[in-house]
Amino acid sequence: MEVQLGLGRVYPRPPSKTYRGAFQNLFQSVREVIQNPGPRHPEAASAAPPGASLLLLQQQQQQQQQQQQQQQQQQQQQQQETSPRQQQQQQGEDGSPQAHRRGPTGYLVLDEEQQPSQPQSALECHPERGCVPEPGAAVAASKGLPQQLPAPPDEDDSAAPSTLSLLGPTFPGLSSCSADLKDILSEASTMQLLQQQQQEAVSEGSSSGRAREASGAPTSSKDNYLGGTSTISDNAKELCKAVSVSMGLGVEALEHLSPGEQLRGDCMYAPLLGVPPAVRPTPCAPLAECKGSLLDDSAGKSTEDTAEYSPFKGGYTKGLEGESLGCSGSAAAGSSGTLELPSTLSLYKSGALDEAAAYQSRDYYNFPLALAGPPPPPPPPHPHARIKLENPLDYGSAWAAAAAQCRYGDLASLHGAGAAGPGSGSPSAAASSSWHTLFTAEEGQLYGPCGGGGGGGGGGGGGGGGGGGGGGGEAGAVAPYGYTRPPQGLAGQESDFTAPDVWYPGGMVSRVPYPSPTCVKSEMGPWMDSYSGPYGDMRLETARDHVLPIDYYFPPQKTCLICGDEASGCHYGALTCGSCKVFFKRAAEGKQKYLCASRNDCTIDKFRRKNCPSCRLRKCYEAGMTLGARKLKKLGNLKLQEEGEASSTTSPTEETTQKLTVSHIEGYECQPIFLNVLEAIEPGVVCAGHDNNQPDSFAALLSSLNELGERQLVHVVKWAKALPGFRNLHVDDQMAVIQYSWMGLMVFAMGWRSFTNVNSRMLYFAPDLVFNEYRMHKSRMYSQCVRMRHLSQEFGWLQITPQEFLCMKALLLFSIIPVDGLKNQKFFDELRMNYIKELDRIIACKRKNPTSCSRRFYQLTKLLDSVQPIARELHQFTFDLLIKSHMVSVDFPEMMAEIISVQVPKILSGKVKPIYFHTQ
């Protein structure tokens, strides 16, 4: 024999889940115990409706008088209608009737009627009275004792087998219940059998039911299986739970109940309590009121209309017509007695529910769902087993407004008839649907291969765009959110479309994954708003948030610029605390030389500022602190004092003061403060990270040069930030000046390193990356390397001093601007002129002859002009290399690639031009 199992009960299932043999007795006992509520919970009786007590009283009065008569009538009818062949099959080899046989639908029949041969005490112990049957009752049935023969296929409803009585004609509104509830109560493979059984029982059971009612026959225990007046006793629940757990079944519904609580109306143990279907409340009524429209499903809809298949392969989702949220809420639902599910219930439906492993590897929250609108009604307190309750997220108007501003288009225009969700059959259902249209069919390319434009949204089977679904509906309907679309070649073939294992109604959403196109870099963004560059919308504006944050390079002046402590005022030209003020005075005036024990990059903060005096002093110079700033302040006070005493007579003391002042100013001019700042902020040595143990190759050398350029660019930004007057420029002008002049600055600094380190015989890019003749040829930029080496040799021929180099390098920063000008062009011109004057002052400091000073100024400015053509050639070379980088396997760091792709084309096209001192 075989017994079909469900979640904690006996009901028809597909033949894959069967247990044979020894479990028959255990299941028979479990079923009888479940049917006996027991009188142990008096509070459960008080929780039942008033109609339940009246029904129980009538059944108790009629049970003792007419139980015997009913069983005799059933035996007579069975003997009259049973054919001789069936009687022969029912007899065993020893002549005794078989204890069990197959029912009309092929399911096992488990008889539960009391035998006439049993004593009267056994008959009085009925499940409706709350007493527990004797343990030997179930055992006797399995040992071949005489038992009641089941009814033939065309018998009335009272003699139906107990397994079918759970889902057969006694279950109200089976044909009109929602598709989700149908999948819970009976799988897709057994739904047709139950519907046929229901149609037969409706036609045949009406006459027998009227005859039984006229004769006063009570309803049997099978008819009232769902109509108990009390909850399950503790023993029954514990026994059912133990058996279910031992067999791998889930009884989550029982775990949520405490003694005395009522179960949900759609639960398998919930009592209907004899209330007519017409007066039962409709759980989906609040949903219909919330949506503002009623679904026009009629109560007399046939089973074929309500069991329509959606376009999903295999028919996994049935009866979705008019149920955009898994709810069959209609105006006539109350009168038809339909058992409905609230909108917040969402099923984990699978095409392979028999495999337990199907649930273990699923990610139920990895689907791009979105909701914008009023939230559904709150979930009920106790969910059914296999139904998961989720509280939907309400993004409200803020989410709707944000979605409307999405770069993929206005979402308000996407709410059409095709956006009502899968299988929305009526126009009212489509209008009242809450399926969000954030991801349209044309945007499927962002999340996977698009399945074409097939999809119909019309009719009862519209499944969405790209699904090849049935029904010629609106083009471009919204595709279901939870599945992968078929390949391009299989877009129109429904047989090749694999339906999702899990379908989510609109009431479930966990997170909304936003699209991340691969063309947009994840770490970098644009710097400029005026030029989109060859990559479309990709700009470099947000690059400062990752690599060059403007807040980092230009912090607010509220704390000490050296250690970050609270600043006490402006000391020696910078906003510092008292401790750093005293330290700088002693360190700058003293003759002690500080050396860093590390790599000149020690952290200087409030707690570690005394660890490394060398790095602290260097940071003071970078902040602009100089001893001359204090002297200039004194000179300013002295000048004001002289103006106040202009009316007084001249005295010998005043003449002496004027002589000291003039000599002091002349001495100050020969030792400019500007040089002290430039020496302090000059960047240190930067390594390229090149592996010199590997053989030289074009890709390796150029990749190392690009990496070195990225590292040096960061130092250039820090150096420019520390230049006097640079912070007074507009922020956009600051970033533009750095982006346009970075190549010339690096070439000029590399030429100086080559002159000081290798006497201009090689190109000293970095200590670990020095180019000789072989590497110049290997890098395929030999002509550019020759010009850079010639620039390095100019430093030796002209005998450039370190002071002249520092001033020329600072002036080179302000030597290239856009043709249209900067945002604050006037201040830029003034700042550039000040740096030119500083260069002239440095020249005049060493030379007393004006003719010699003019000649020197001419030589230095010609050297500055010679840097611009070299930088332009390197701009062209790097831009061409970036375009072919994927072909030659040359790596470009993010920041370098952004600047080369966005700013270099402006220089090459003539929108940005250098400022020359001499006519070219």
Swiss-Prot record:
Changing Q445R: In AIS; uncertain significance. This is Androgen receptor. Changing L702H: Found in prostate cancer. Changing S783N: In prostate cancer; somatic mutation. Changing K721A: Loss of transcription activation in the presence of androgen and of interaction with NCOA2. Changing F726L: In a patient with severe hypospadias. Changing M808R: In AIS; loss of transactivation. Changing G751D: In AIS; loss of androgen binding. Changing T576A: In prostate cancer. Changing T878A: Found in prostate cancer; found in bone metastases; alters receptor specificity so that transcription is activated by antiandrogens such as cyproterone acetate. Residues 44-91, 195-217 have a biased composition (Low complexity). Belongs to the nuclear hormone receptor family. NR3 subfamily. It comes from Homo sapiens. The modification Phosphoserine is found at S83, S96, S258, S651. There is a cross-link at K846, K848 (Glycyl lysine isopeptide (Lys-Gly) (interchain with G-Cter in ubiquitin)). PROSITE patterns: NR_LBD, NUCLEAR_REC_DBD_1, NUCLEAR_REC_DBD_2. The modification Phosphotyrosine is found at Y225, Y269, Y309, Y348, Y359, Y364, Y365, Y395, Y535, Y552, Y916. Transmembrane segments: none annotated. Residues 552-919 are annotated as: Interaction with LPXN. Changing L702A: Alters receptor specificity, so that transcription is activated by the antiandrogen cyproterone acetate. Changing S815N: In AIS and PAIS. The record marks E898 as: Interaction with coactivator FXXLF and FXXFY motifs. There is a cross-link at K388, K521 (Glycyl lysine isopeptide (Lys-Gly) (interchain with G-Cter in SUMO)). Changing Q671R: In prostate cancer.
